[in-house]
Amino acid sequence: MNALHQKCAVCGRFTTEFNYSVLSCNSCKIFFRRLIVRTVPIKKCFRGERCFEKTPYIFKCTSCRFQKCLYVGMTLPSYLLVLEQNKEQRLAITIDCVRNTHNKRMDSLFNFFVTEMNPNVDDIVELNKITYTKRDEHIRMDFQTWAFHSCVTTIDFMKQFPFVNLLRSTDQMILLKESYVKLGALISATRAYSSKKQCISFPDGTDCLPKTQWTVPKISPNLENRIRCRVIDKLRELNIQNDEFYLLSVLLFCNPAITNLSENGQLLLTSYQKMYSSALLYYCLLTYQKSGPSRFSELLGLFTLLGQHYDDIIHYYVLMQLNQSEVELKKLVKDGIEAAYKS
């Protein structure tokens, strides 16, 4: 076919350009480039997500147009990836971006609180912006309040990354539900490790497990100690560095293998997983030289331990229910735990 008669794979306009691995017009190239770096959620499609299935396409639907970009095979541009020609600069930018986002989460966790009374995960995820209120020193924070606030700030942290906001609403919900308890555990354990503490706790020292009403313990102390200490012990064994933690924290939830994701959701997460994993690998090669590949594997092995930690939390939660504990968890905390056996 004559080049003049070829059509953009996304919108069908005539074009001779090839952008992001796909035959695509200049308009769709600019559209894709703008979206892959935005941190503001895309407006949901209210037409059943079929605006680009057949002509005439509805170009005003940002969500469907972006999904079509993914479907036809558009890939992340080289300037977002840690490649041979831009390695050190791109690595520094990537780490700085994650570090700054973590610092914002820490400020929200330590100095603010959320006024919503008892929302569930759907309520929090659907908020375009979470509103925080400055916390006075006299405000009392107990286990229930800290656990809830930690979950809110963790979800908010995840939603600051472009790939989360680019997912379809159903995929976004699946990703966040599957990940925020594990990510919160990694962040809390790293904070404890950096502070040279032996156990996971909340910022004011409140235990990460609730106080129960039982005079005689009904849950194994070994299980409780695993929840409090095992992840920190592994971090200490690895002697994990801050930059490694930053990259791992994003890789933890940038996971295309999560069950029930759509094909487009898997494609998007695969692209960003490649971006962050290549950054971590290059960091390891730069820092540890010949030992870089083995260090990279050791760090990724932490995800297996976090899965076991999550299983322990679920086990603990089930035992609390079986033993009729009087501890009442907030909906958001329960949703994160119950996601494992409701998906």
Swiss-Prot record:
UniProt name for this protein: Nuclear hormone receptor family member nhr-167
Keyword Transmembrane: no
Domain NR LBD: 101-339
Disulfide partners: none
Keyword DNA-binding: yes
First and last residues of each zinc finger (NR C4-type): 8-28, 45-64
Stored InterPro entries: NHR-like_dom_sf, Nucl_hrmn_rcpt_lig-bd, Znf_hrmn_rcpt, Znf_NHR/GATA
SMART domains referenced in this protein's UniProt entry, alphabetically: HOLI, ZnF_C4
A GO term from the CC aspect: nucleus
Similarity-based family: Belongs to the nuclear hormone receptor family.
Compartments, as annotated in UniProt: Nucleus
Biological source species: Caenorhabditis elegans
Annotated region of DNA binding: 5-81
GO molecular function, one term: sequence-specific DNA binding
Keywords carried by this UniProt record: DNA-binding, Metal-binding, Nucleus, Receptor, Transcription, Transcription regulation, Zinc, Zinc-finger
Recorded superkingdom: Eukaryota
